[in-house]
Amino acid sequence: MTSKSLSAWVIHKQWSGDTSARLKLFTRELGLINCLCKGGRTPKKQSLLQAFIPLWVSIEERYDQYYTRNIESTSSRLDLEGHSLFSGLYINELLYYTLSPDFPDPDLFDAYLFTLNGIALAREREAIEALLRRFEWALLKACGYTFSFLHEARTGELIVPDSYYQFVAGEGFILGGDKEIPGEHLLAIAADNLSEPAYLKSAKFIMRQAINHLLGGREIKARSLYGPA
């Protein structure tokens, strides 16, 4: 029997039997894990087992299954509403569908915290969208699916500001094509410059295609609520 203490967030919850809950937790130490919480239906635990509450969770592993031993909140629930709430649900769904269990990535965990806190404070939709685009890129990197914004995918030549490019999922950017993106926009995105509406629009277009490729046909329900990507 192995016991661990984890910094965690609830990504998904499903009731199990009359008293327990099956949890999908995103943790700094172990990545995404599946965990059984006995007594999860009690009022005290139900108040904790919600999305957007930072948790400190003690778990034990028995026969390749994680069980919670103790759950505490480390802070109050993030105040997400409207666009911020739908965006939080969106990134939770992304983690749920794309991450393999038990694959820790502290950088992605930090990006998740930064994004959640950022969208909780953001007052403009454009600021929320920029945060989402950066989180999507962090997720793509964590999943080993990256591409260059600085080089043409097939020739390796540098992206030219005055040229136009097409994004090909699984490859990157190729010169010309039906759905053309200015090279200037690609270079701005590479420099993390999403301050111009046109750059942000191109980033949204690119990331939607890249994330769809990563999802492999799985549907993100939060998109129908808000359409953040």
Swiss-Prot record:
Keyword DNA repair attached: yes
Coiled coil, from the record: none
Top-level lineage group: Bacteria
A Gene Ontology BP annotation from the UniProt entry: DNA recombination
UniProt KW Nucleus keyword: no
Protein keywords: DNA damage, DNA recombination, DNA repair
GO terms for cellular component: bacterial nucleoid
Entry's family note: Belongs to the RecO family.
Function text: Involved in DNA repair and RecF pathway recombination.
Protein name: DNA repair protein RecO
Organism: Legionella pneumophila (strain Lens)
Name of the gene encoding the protein in the UniProt record: recO
